[in-house]
Each structure stands twice: as structure tokens, then as C-alpha cells.
UniProtKB/Swiss-Prot annotation:
Primary localisation category: membrane
Bilayer topology: Lipid-anchor; GPI-anchor
Glycosylation site residues: N46
SUPFAM superfamilies: Bifunctional inhibitor/lipid-transfer protein/seed storage 2S albumin
Record family assignment: Belongs to the plant LTP family.
Covalent lipidation (GPI-anchor amidated asparagine), chain numbering: N149
Keyword Disulfide bond: yes
Signal peptide: 1-20
Name of the protein described by the UniProt record: Non-specific lipid transfer protein GPI-anchored 12
Cellular component GO terms held in the UniProt record: peroxisome; plasma membrane; side of membrane
Organism: Arabidopsis thaliana (Mouse-ear cress)
Source taxonomy: Eukaryota, Viridiplantae, Streptophyta, Embryophyta, Tracheophyta
Disulphide bridges: C40-C83, C50-C67, C68-C110, C81-C120
Length: 176
């Protein structure tokens, strides 16, 4: 039987293999990741004080005072929803177009340790591209092909991670 330490090492090894892939970010739409944006609706509502800071065109120098405690609560209760925030999950539901740089810097500004956008991508959650970047793309066939290949890599890493997580769960349950 595998020990807990062996399983942890295998998980870390697998994560490092998948994180070596660098797929381009998907379009800034609310695509479903492993956890549907509907599951994060309450968490998104709870960080609504952050929206005025992270929206495209915001002139605010810092987030509202209530934003940082709300973000810390989201990270503690449902960190996958932070990935949803990076992925634009707030955009269609609340009419907020997110500025990628501001969304990614929010945890640093608030002093909250949150999942990084690159980790969210590895785990299969969409992340948004920089504001306006889709308008400035050349639209060449080569770049479209690269985007599709990157999306496939992320998809398969996400599926493999989910399978590995289930394997770990069953192993831990059988050890009990």
C-alpha cells in the first residue's frame, strides 16, 4: 500500500509536470472551470466591494476598505472562487469587465495569500487575458492553432488532476 508521503510526492510530481505547460489564456468570458461560476455566486457577491477597483478603466488608487477582508474570506472559504474571479466569472453576472493586472494584484495589495492565476490555469480554471488584448491580436491561423493546442493541454492536465484527486481520495478512504 502507498503511504501518505508517497502519495504527496506523486501529487507534487504530477503538478510540476502539468505546470510546465504554458497555454495562452482563454478569452475573457465566464467559461466553466472545474467548479461552475454558479457555485461561486455568493462568494462573488461577498467581494462586490472589490469590483470598483478591478474593473477596466478604474481610476481608484486602492480598493475600498471592505474589499480586503471580503477577499480574505473568499480565499479561506472557497479559494476556487478566486480562480473564478481571475477568470472573469464576475463579468456577465454583475456587468463588470475585469482588468487582469488589477485582479491579479488584488491579493498582493490586500496582503492575502491567494491562488495564483498560473495555478488556476493548471487546475483547469480559465483566466482572463489583459484588457483589450483580443482586439490587438493579429488573428493569424498559427496563433489560433497554438491557442487550441494550449487549451487541450490545460484540459487534459485538469482531467488528469481530477482523476488523481479521486485516486487519492479512494486511497485515503481505504487506509482509514
Amino acid at each position: 500500500m502507498l503511504t501518505t508521503n508517497t502519495l504527496a510526492v506523486l501529487l507534487l510530481l504530477f503538478l510540476s509536470l502539468c505546470s510546465g505547460q504554458s497555454p495562452p489564456a482563454p478569452e475573457p468570458i465566464a467559461a466553466d472551470g472545474p467548479s461552475s461560476p454558479v457555485n461561486c455566486l455568493v462568494s462573488m457577491l461577498n467581494v462586490s466591494d472589490c469590483f470598483s477597483y478591478v474593473q477596466v478603466g478604474s481610476n481608484e488608487i486602492k480598493p475600498e476598505a471592505a474589499c480586503c477582508p471580503e477577499l480574505a474570506g473568499m480565499v479561506q472559504s472557497s479559494p476556487e472562487c478566486v480562480c473564478n474571479l481571475y477568470g472573469g466569472g464576475a463579468s456577465p453576472r454583475f456587468g463588470v469587465k475585469l482588468d487582469k493586472q488589477r485582479a491579479e494584484q488584488l491579493s498582493t495589495i490586500c496582503g492575502v495569500k491567494a491562488p495564483s492565476p498560473s495555478l488556476c490555469s493548471v487546475l483547469g480554471f480559465p483566466t482572463i487575458s489583459p484588457a483589450g488584448s483580443e482586439d490587438s491580436s493579429s488573428g493569424s491561423e498559427g496563433s489560433d492553432k497554438d491557442k487550441k493546442n494550449g487549451a487541450m493541454t490545460t484540459k487534459y492536465c485538469g482531467v488528469a488532476l481530477n482523476s488523481l484527486a479521486l485516486l487519492l481520495l479512494f486511497t485515503f478512504l481505504s487506509l482509514s
